[in-house]
Amino acid sequence: MRLRGILFDLDDTLADSSGTEEVVWERVADVIDEHVDGIDRSELRRRYLDVLEGHYSELAAGRIDFVTFRRRRLADALSPWGEVSEELLERYIAAKEAIADEMRPFPDAVATVRALRGEGIRVGVLTNGPSRFQRRKLEVSGLGPELDAIAISEELGVAKPDPEAFEQALALLGTRAEETAMVGDSLENDVAGGLGAGLAAVVWMPGRREGELPPGAHLARELAEVPRLLGLAV
């Protein structure tokens, strides 16, 4: 069956967040320093990264919302030094969300999306994250108006890799699973999720990530490679 649609992940797939991570971390650490005494930044960062997976799995499963996710992650990371006040939580969230204003599309993102749409392919985004945060990224990066559909986990009420997230995104895109591909940087959320949802094809764009490409998936180093890998002449 001819491919009629493609769903892209947003962060580190269409838009580049790699250059913003250090900046945002420094902002977050500065905010914490102002509220909590005796912080060891290197230890704080280690703990901050270590506690991510456990809380994110709760978020992805829909058992907690993004505010709760951020509160619990920060509280766990800070537990050796003290408790998280409401003021600290608010300033922490503001510092985290400032990353949206730093987002830029990859150099070939807009051209690739336009080329695909020019060939009649419907193009959408399926992204995990808070609605306000992700929509701001799409606005700042200029990608929003280029898309046929935008599916954000907070709005869907379910996150990748749950098959229901893909089902809802397909409904917004107006295509069926067997005629739609998924492109993203996460082996779990995008590749395994897309395969599990029965999509026609999945493309892994690892960027700085490491992992083993599963059977049935394609590997792309740049967005411009995606159409060729999917057998599209654009």
Locate each region found by the language model.
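Short helix-capping segments at alpha-helix termini
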Residues: D33-I39, P80-S85, G142-E146, G174-T175
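A metal-dependent, Asp-based hydrolase signature
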Residues: R46, D50-A94
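Short, acidic loop-to-helix structural element flanking the phosphoryl-transfer center
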Residues: R63, V67-T68, E86-E87, A94-V125, ...
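Alpha-helical elements of Rossmann-like donor-binding domains used by nucleotide-donor carbohydrate transfer enzymes
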Residues: V23, R27, R47, R73-D76, ...
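Hydrophobic alpha-helical core bundles mediating ligand binding, dimerization, or RNAP-core interactions
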Residues: E21-I32, Y48-L52, R70, L74, ...
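Alpha-helix N-cap/helix-initiation sites
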Residues: S17, E21-E22, G38-S42, R63-V67, ...
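Asp-based, Mg2+/Mn2+-dependent phosphohydrolase catalytic module
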Residues: M1-I6, S18-G19, V110, R114, ...
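Active-site neighborhood of HAD-like aspartate-dependent phosphohydrolases
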Residues: M1-R47
